[in-house]
Amino acid sequence: MQQFTIRTRLLMLVGAMFIGFITIELMGFSALQRGVASLNTVYLDRVVPLRDLKTIADLYAVKIVDSSHKARSGRMTYAQAEQEVKDAGRQIDMLWHAYQKTKKIDEEQRSVDALAKLVDEAQDPIERLKGILERGDKAALDTFVENEMYPLIDPLSEGLSHLTQIQVEESKRAYDAAVVLYDSSRTMLALLLLGILICGGVFATRLIRSIIHPLTTLKDAAARVALGDLSQSIQVSGRNEVTDVQQSVQAMQANLRNTLQDIQGSAAQLAAAAEELQTATESTAQGIHRQNDEMQMAATAVTEMSAAVDEVADNANRTSNASHEAMDLADGGRKQVMLTRETIDRLSGKLNETTRTVFRLAEEASNIGRVLDVIRAIAEQTKLLALNAAIEAAHAGEAGRGFAVVADEVRNLAQRTQTSTQEIERMISAIQSVTQEGVRDVQQSCEFAARSQTMSSEADQALTLIAERITEINGMNLVIASAAEEQAQVAREVDRNLVAISDISEQSTAGVQQTSEASEELARLAANLNNLVNRFSM
């Protein structure tokens, strides 16, 4: 992994996490779309047909039968009863044709074919009933109601009841399929998310180690340099931002070692010159000329030392420039981390859109619930109508017994409709619960995106620490440059002293003592330089 730059490694981590979360989002969208399609099928092919079948059953059992009985008992005129029967016939035709256009299973289609024959066979008796009501023939109406009405209506009611039961069973099957779809989608998403988290965790751990280990090595090397240990070389491996800094510090260490070696050599030369100068001062006056020659040699050595010090200053300046370049690279890494955080923010926006989609699904489920409320209200009204019909049949005595049977069947049908509506309500509640769990899953994905953003912030902090360490190295370069400047000043001062000693030696013999003192000062300076260099282990 050291062969890749930190930027490349971070992009690989974020890219892998981004692809994983996009995959989860697409799978979630797919599951939601299939769930919406299932709900749409339940509503259009089951709930609406259930409503229409219930209405058709009510039209046969309430409108036609009830109007006939009311016309017999005189509570409704024959013209009103005829109009009620005609209206019921038109509504039955309209609803029946609409129902036949819906999607059906094989069992349902067979029941529809059988019921269609009964509906067609009922047309002629109903037309005769219309004619009886139009003529106002009470005897014919009594005969029709007692002999033909219930043999006509009862098979129709049974067929409609059977179709209603099929709608309920198919709604239950659709619900079971939706539950299976939800369970499989949830398991798949959970496994995929777990795999992404495990892979991301392993990759992130390796990434952190690949950054921390070379930084720790670099820190230890810098600490050794600060303690004066220049004997151990810095190991450089890989091609990334950290290795660039390692190479810069390695070059700085080598330059510092060479500089100290030059200083050590110059100090040795200076010590030798001082000893020679001391020997010359102990000689007789005849040795003054020879002493001047030695002074010239000492001046030459100081000049060489000054040149070496200038070279040290130049090396320190080049090291400072390398540190600035490393700082620029660290700033570039921080900018890449900022781009990574922006990418994660866009991912969070996509997850928020997914949440809004799930909420719309919940709203659609609530709309279905309102439709069920309407169906339940119709069932309650039907039960009340059946109860009223039973009461009226009881008032009619023996003549209303058949009508009482029909009213009881209508009430039972309304009760079954109400029970089916409650079952569908439970299904809708389960779907809403599943939708809420989907919202929580998407919110967890948002939290994982936020954690990825936190990891990017930590990488930014790591780059900031690198920049701080580079600043410290730059400060060390400034210290080295300052020391070199001080050494140059000392060399120039020594040169001036040598010139003064030479002048004094030429003027008088008394200057021999002063020259001796100057030579002793030079010896001390050489010893100090040696002590300073000996602090470093090379």
Swiss-Prot record:
Lineage: Bacteria, Pseudomonadati, Pseudomonadota, Gammaproteobacteria, Pseudomonadales
Its job: Chemotactic-signal transducers respond to changes in the concentration of attractants and repellents in the environment, transduce a signal from the outside to the inside of the cell, and facilitate sensory adaptation through the variation of the level of methylation. Chemoreceptor for naphthalene or a related compound. May facilitate biodegradation.
Null mutant phenotype: Mutant grows on naphthalene but is not chemotactic to this aromatic hydrocarbon. Mutant has a wild-type chemotactic response to succinate, benzoate, salicylate and 4-hydroxybenzoate.
Sorted UniProt keywords: Cell inner membrane, Cell membrane, Chemotaxis, Membrane, Methylation, Plasmid, Transducer, Transmembrane, Transmembrane helix
Residues in compartment: Cytoplasmic: 1-9, 209-538
GO biological process: chemotaxis; signal transduction
Subcellular location: Cell inner membrane
Protein name: Methyl-accepting chemotaxis protein NahY
CDD domains on file: HAMP (cd06225), MCP_signal (cd11386)
